[in-house]
Amino acid sequence: MVTQPSISVRGEVTLEVDPEIAVVSIAVMARDKDRRRALDLLAKRNAAVLAMARALGDAVEKVESGAASVHPELKDGTKERVTGYVARGNVTVTISDFTVLSDMVTGLAGEEMVAVTGPWWSLRPDSPVRRRARVSAAQDALQRAREYADAFGATVTELVQLADPGLLADADRPQIVHARTAGRAEAFATAAAAEELEFEPVKQSVRAVVDARFLMTAPTLGG
């Protein structure tokens, strides 16, 4: 019995696209000799940060507050002597309109006892770019199979299998799409007004890989 010849190929594609969102992390801190006053001061500064972020309206996609903490400061060389208390909080802001990013970071950096880290550029988890990359990888696999078949005077006739990388051989863990999220700047608050910071969105690399197996017509072998 003659087995119909097959072709196993890997399709892959890398897309370079603009980011869809930018994430900025804002650390808020307060220090006082009294624990209650330290917490009250933290609450006041945290509220100011939240108000500044929310004032940007639709440009901000999401605002999230992290857990707050307060701990005593001990005098050097002692275990029990408390000299004051430090309270900390964190706010994470996700921005979709990058035109407000510079003003927001510069404004936040001007707040007392506030540290700004970011932005981190990325795509949304449900970004259509990810689907586009997967489809392009599948199309690349088909094109490769056709080229290989054509080299032997044959044509592709049927798709047998299409799978994430490694699954055809039950080997590697699948890894279809990932996005490179790069580009970060840091701005730490000072009492003086900060110069306006400029941010250039960093392109995101989205890579998709698929394995495929096709059947083809009988090859024409010379010689």
Q: Over which residues does each language-model region extend?
A:
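Short, charge-dense linear interaction motifs
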Residues: M1-G223
